[in-house]
Amino acid sequence: MIVLGVESSCDETGVGLVSEGVLLGDALASSMDAHARFGGVVPEVAARAHLEAIVPVMHEALGKAGLDLADVDAVAVTAGPGLSTAVQVGLASAKALAFALGKPLYGVHHLAGHAAVDVLEHGPLPRRCVALVVSGGHTSLLLLGDLARDPIVHLGDTIDDAAGEAFDKVARVLGLGYPGGPSIDRAARDGDPRAIAFPRALSRAQDPAYGFSFSGVKTAVARWVEARQDAGGEVPVADVAASFQEAVADVLTRKAVAACREHGVDALLLVGGVAANTRVRALAEQRCAAAGLELRVPPIRLCTDNGAMIAAVGDLLVRAGAPASGLDLGADPSAPLTGALLAGPWS
């Protein structure tokens, strides 16, 4: 069975083809440069870019896989969450393709795709694991069982900014480029992560154990920089970037390891765009090794949004015998995560 996956939840247009847990081919187009001058993603710009890119990207993915559309057995698509107009472009394209081919359509949850993509690199997921999903729009700790069949348990989420969003905003304060994650990562290489003690929110005993908050550290950086400039001093960009990055990585990895311990699982899955950050990865490796946990992190190119991850979760659903979604499937920009299928657990 060959599953074609379509991703369009934000600013990447992705198509991937997966069969039996093996990535056959994928392609990606990004409208990131078009958003750079705005300092963030503009939904209508993203949607227009998806419209222009979806067909060429699909042909490129098929070409890499050495396949034709006639070889596709099922279509999976991100039906939420995400930017409304962006999600709708991918969903409409996937519906049209499924209808034209007479193949089943599976509307999947974007975050389940991030978890499923690791299967393409490291094989089947452990029977139970904790997933730390960290991106521009999401920061969540999830307890996973059988990803295709079981309910996904939310252990905690951010109560304000996602980690990736905080990276973008701090990068803007420091005059670095967009997107902020890679810019801060590069700047931090020459900095001292202990130079400035930025706050670690929700770290007290009485705070939610697995809740996150990055609005405070973002504001703390802005105020520190403003005070330095008002005093006529030069802003040590590398030190600020490294200290901010350390604060975020510390909270993310500490809470993720604690979740594994408390729930009796021995594997941590680190996924999402921020999983590409070198300090987050390094600290996760260090803390998982100390705790005797297996750490699974997809290749960097599969950490950010892509079509392969949607094909991967679609492949799991097809092999598990999940019911198809049907062509009346609607987009849900704020879809709650209860299962890999947007409609929730089915078994």
UniProtKB/Swiss-Prot annotation:
GO biological process, one term: tRNA threonylcarbamoyladenosine modification
Catalytic reaction(s) noted: L-threonylcarbamoyladenylate + adenosine(37) in tRNA = N(6)-L-threonylcarbamoyladenosine(37) in tRNA + AMP + H(+)
Protein origin, superkingdom: Bacteria
Pfam short name (any one): TsaD
EC number assigned by the record: 2.3.1.234
Cofactor annotation: Fe(2+)
Subcellular location: Cytoplasm
Keyword field: Acyltransferase, Cytoplasm, Iron, Metal-binding, Transferase, tRNA processing
Cross-referenced CDD domains: ASKHA_NBD_TsaD_bac
UniProt binding sites for substrate: V133, V134, S135, G136, G137, D168, G181, D185, N277
Gene3D superfamilies on file: 3.30.420.40
Positions bound to Fe cation: H110, H114, D305
Coiled-coil zones: none
Cofactor binding summary note: Binds 1 Fe(2+) ion per subunit.
GO MF assignments: iron ion binding; N(6)-L-threonylcarbamoyladenine synthase activity
Cellular component, GO annotation: cytoplasm
Family named by the database record: Belongs to the KAE1 / TsaD family.
Chain's role: Required for the formation of a threonylcarbamoyl group on adenosine at position 37 (t(6)A37) in tRNAs that read codons beginning with adenine. Is involved in the transfer of the threonylcarbamoyl moiety of threonylcarbamoyl-AMP (TC-AMP) to the N6 group of A37, together with TsaE and TsaB. TsaD likely plays a direct catalytic role in this reaction.
Name of this protein: tRNA N6-adenosine threonylcarbamoyltransferase
Source organism: Kineococcus radiotolerans (strain ATCC BAA-149 / DSM 14245 / SRS30216)
Gene: tsaD
